[in-house]
């Protein structure tokens, strides 16, 4: 017979698994992604796109989040997105990059051509 603590733990995990998204693509640091975010203005919602380089992924399960960095009007902007949040509408991969680190904070100090990341070109198997 299951104890009361076990039943509450099971129900907690059932609620969390209900809230997990299953439409997220598989991406890592160095990839360029496009995140569509729902913005509430008054009574209406609109979609705002944030496209940039993934410099960090963190957490697992419901706490999975990603830090995306982009150039906006000559200033670099970094934004953290909890990916299982209801304000995230869609995440798409623009291009894949090859880096040797999980957290590419060193990209903050680089500028110009030094800040480029080697692109991984899709193969025929990836297109299928």
Swiss-Prot record:
This is Large ribosomal subunit protein bL19. Transmembrane segments: none annotated. One of its GO terms (cellular component) is cytosolic large ribosomal subunit. One of its GO terms (biological process) is translation. Pfam families: Ribosomal_L19 (PF01245). InterPro entries: Ribosomal_bL19, Ribosomal_bL19_CS, Ribosomal_bL19_sf, Translation_prot_SH3-like_sf. This protein is located at the 30S-50S ribosomal subunit interface and may play a role in the structure and function of the aminoacyl-tRNA binding site. Keywords: Ribonucleoprotein, Ribosomal protein. Belongs to the bacterial ribosomal protein bL19 family. One of its GO terms (molecular function) is structural constituent of ribosome.
């Amino acid at each position: 017979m299951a104890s009361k603590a076990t039943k509450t733990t099971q129900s907690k995990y059932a609620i969390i698994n209900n809230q997990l998204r299953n439409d997220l693509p598989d991406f890592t640091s160095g990839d360029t992604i496009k995140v569509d975010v729902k913005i509430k203005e008054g009574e209406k919602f609109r979609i705002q796109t944030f496209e940039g380089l993934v410099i960090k992924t963190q957490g697992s399960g419901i706490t999975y989040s990603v830090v995306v960095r982009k150039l906006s009007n000559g200033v670099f902007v970094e934004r953290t997105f909890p990916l299982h949040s209801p304000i995230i509408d869609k995440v798409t991969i623009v291009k894949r990059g090859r880096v040797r680190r999980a957290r590419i904070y060193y990209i903050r100090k680089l500028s110009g051509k030094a800040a480029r990341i080697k692109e991984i070109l899709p193969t025929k198997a990836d297109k299928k």
